[in-house]
Amino acid sequence: MQLMTTSEIYAVGVPIILMMIGLEVIFSVYKKRDLYSLGDTGGTLGLLTGNIFVSLSTQGLMLGLYFYLYQFRLITINDLFPPWLIILATFLTVDLVFYWYHRASHRVRFLWAIHMNHHSSTEMNFSVAFRQAWFGPLSKVPFFLCMPIIGFDPSITLVAGVCSTLWGVVGHTQWIDKLGWLDGIFNTPSTHRVHHGSNAEYIDRNYGNLLIVWDRVFGTYAKEESPVIFGLVDNVGTNNPVAITFHTWASIIRDVRRARSLYEVCGYIFGPPDWIPAIKPDSDAPLQSLTSLSIDQGSEFR
């Protein structure tokens, strides 16, 4: 089975993406929309630089791990199905695994500490797709280890992953309006704007990367209706990539240091970003609620 290499895919995809960004900038200036700002774009470039460095530093090890695990695969998918079905199955499985990785990155606090970097922009444009966390290349590895074990060829999985990543760029724009029935099947600009919204009705919605049907199946789908407010519920207030990267980690460390038990330590690290320990009914202290959270905790919420 002959597929394009990742280098060939990037050679085609990157110029197209750069052209899209250029056209969006022209559109922004012409329509006086202010879709881009120098500070926000600078923060994105700082985060992207760190992400690329970590990715290049670890990709050999990660690929080696995938191919090592492939030796112990449960089935050999390449021997069971025709090429077109292998490619289709790989793309669908990559997208499904990504859905759960993405969902976990919003609902597990230490993963959110990484992923919130991507949501730290209060803008929505094609360049925001490249606002990637420094530790992002590492956080997704455990989720995708299942693929070589099941029997998906790592070389095909890699190609599918690159294609899916490039498709994800398309969703980061205000330039393209709703697309009707396509919004209910694919991750379109409309559905992904919802995902980046800090509106209460949009929080933790639309995790899909290629297909949005996973969200419809697992109950996390939302249509774009009210105007989207981009960013975090409480924004970090800086474009410094170092400050953004360690913003939530700092609050996790503070919470862990004041934890009263191992249970609370685990809750602060592995629980949802808005997790707080319950107050015992017989305690003299008032019952805690989300409204009594510290500023440090609240500032990381979506």
Describe the residue ranges of each PLM region.
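Membrane-embedded catalytic scaffold of the fatty acid hydroxylase/desaturase
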Residues: 49-61, 76, 81-232
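Membrane-interface helix-loop junction between the first two transmembrane segments
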Residues: 22-42
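Cytosolic-facing loops and C-terminal tails of multi-pass membrane proteins
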Residues: 228-302
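Membrane-interface helix termini and inter-helical loops of multi-pass transporters
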Residues: 68-78
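Loop-to-helix transition at the N-terminal end of transmembrane alpha-helices
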Residues: 12, 35-52
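Helix-boundary and loop/linker segments of multi-pass membrane transporters
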Residues: 2-6, 35-40, 76-83, 117-118
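Hydrophobic transmembrane alpha-helical segments in integral membrane proteins
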Residues: 2-17
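Central hydrophobic cores of alpha-helical transmembrane segments in multi-pass inner-membrane proteins
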Residues: 16-28, 91-96
